[in-house]
Amino acid sequence: MKIAVVYWSGTGNTEAMAQAVAEGAKNAGGDVSLLTSADFGASDMDTYDAVPFGCPAMGSEELEDGEFGPMFSDCEKKLSGKKIALFGSYGWGDGEWLRTWEDTCRSDGAVLACESVMCNEAPDDEGLDACRKLGAALLS
């Protein structure tokens, strides 16, 4: 199964999460590509069986809108029936950005493979383990 782990990271926290997601998917037998949002677009969606997306909360609990947001908006038309998962880090708030993002994906018809993973600031061992499990869940 081909998996693209697509993420944007400003501080390295979401990047660390993305690496753990990729590790979990590889260990479960996936053919994994780790890509930044600058290197992925809607035209790539059909190449992959599953796409976990990672983005931190920005501003008032929103997706990063300079690079990740436009890429994700472009991909939305390809989400119907696609197996995906969501992850990201935050520094304040309660994770509203992730719940809103999940609702958007469900409205687009995406199949959420598992519960989303969010970490406050840098992921700890428990957070990284949750990311590995998220990666593995994409193959089940």
Show where each model-derived region lies.
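FMN-binding flavodoxin-like domain, especially the glycine-rich phosphate-binding loop
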Residues: K2-I3, N13-A16, A20-S37, A42-S140
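Aromatic-flanked redox-active Cys/Sec active sites in thiol-based oxidoreductases
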Residues: Y7-T11
